[in-house]
Regions:
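Conserved cytochrome P450 K-helix E-x-x-R motif and the immediately C-terminal K′/meander segment
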Residues: 24, 153-189
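Conserved cytochrome P450 K-helix/beta-meander segment immediately N-terminal to the heme-binding cysteine loop
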Residues: 202-224
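Active-site substrate-recognition loop segments, prototypically the cytochrome P450 B′-helix/B-C loop
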Residues: 1-123, 233
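Cytochrome P450 heme-thiolate "Cys pocket" and heme-binding signature region
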Residues: 33, 38, 51-53, 168, ...
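Cytochrome P450 catalytic-core helices
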Residues: 127-151, 240-260
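Residue-level recognition of short, solvent-exposed, well-ordered loop/turn junctions
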Residues: 192-193
Length: 289
């Protein structure tokens, strides 16, 4: 395994790639402690059955990697994930952060329509389910915030902010993988071509340097100018289903706030055991009068 200054190995400890490294809805404090030691750590090949990889934990570094695909290439094939050189994508869909400045569908070459559908549709059911479950769980865990949202349910800016905070706090996709294309340095650690990198979105979204008191669910966090969370990636390779996820989550929130009574836990939730997806196998809920 690599032995490089500034990147202690964590193969002897329980790595954040383990499914049980995340309590329901709140990242394990192991990520916070590890990030305080180093922004980049080495995960050995025993991690979640994956080959060894560098784990990037800090918001600024994760965002940098997401916005430089000419250095950090997605580990996928197909025309929607073609190489990017000189700031221009070849066979890739250019999109802006949601809400888009232009109709992103119109920006996809006609010959790639099938690939667009093939990339987006298979991921929607599971990702949407995890997103909605995570948003609901945030409200179940914070009944006081739910009550305050109900009192101000006509405040569109607050509702929009609450949707973003649900996404940040829960982070339905825990990590994404990249391959280093050319030598670079992240967090003081040299990375070599061909090495794998796990970008921990959940760690970046709970980085206290970017989001004060990151473990707190604060629906008004994004009302004022704030750094965007990284649930959907960043730049022209951001998630193509971002708008759809936001629409569904907002619709669920509005419907819950308009309904008399309030959701309450109806039993212990059973988390999905995955090192990449953040969701539930079961989330029992009852409705109180």
């Amino acid at each position: 395994m690599p032995q490089r200054r500034g990147a202690p190995a964590i193969s002897t400890a329980r790595p954040p790639g383990r499914a049980d490294a995340h309590a329901c809805g709140v990242p394990h404090d192991r990520l916070e402690r590890l990030r305080a030691r180093t922004p980049v750590a080495w995960l050995d090949e025993r991690t979640a059955g994956q080959p060894g990889a560098w784990a990037v934990l800090r918001y600024s570094d994760v965002r940098h990697a997401l916005t430089h695909p000419e250095v950090f290439a997605p580990q996928m094939g197909g025309p929607l994930h073609g190489p990017v050189t000189g700031g221009e994508a070849h066979g890739a869909a250019h999109i802006d952060m949601d809400p888009p400045a232009r109709d992103m569908l119109a920006r996809i070459p006609s010959g790639e329509a099938v690939d667009f559908v093939g990339e987006v549709v298979p991921e929607l059911p599971e990702t949407l389910r995890n997103t909605l479950a995570g948003g609901l769980y945030a409200l179940l865990r914070h009944p006081g915030e739910y009550a305050r949202l109900r009192e101000r349910q006509d405040d569109d800016a607050l509702i929009d902010s609450a949707v973003e905070e649900m996404l940040r706090w829960w982070t339905p996709v825990l990590q994404v993988w990249r391959t280093v294309l050319r030598a670079t340095t992240v967090g003081g650690v040299p990375l070599l071509p061909g090495e794998n990198v796990a970008l921990w979105l959940v760690s970046a979204n709970h980085d206290g340097e970017t989001f004060p008191d990151p473990g707190r669910f604060a629906p008004d966090r994004f009302v004022q100018a704030a750094r965007p969370h990284l649930c959907f990636g960043f730049g022209h390779r951001a998630c193509l289903g971002a708008r759809l996820a936001r629409v569904h989550l907002r619709a669920m929130l509005v419907a819950l706030l308009e309904r008399p009574g309030a959701p309450r836990p109806a039993g212990e939730p059973v988390p999905l055991r995955s090192s990449a997806r953040h969701g539930f196998v079961h989330l029992p809920v009852r409705w109180s009068d």
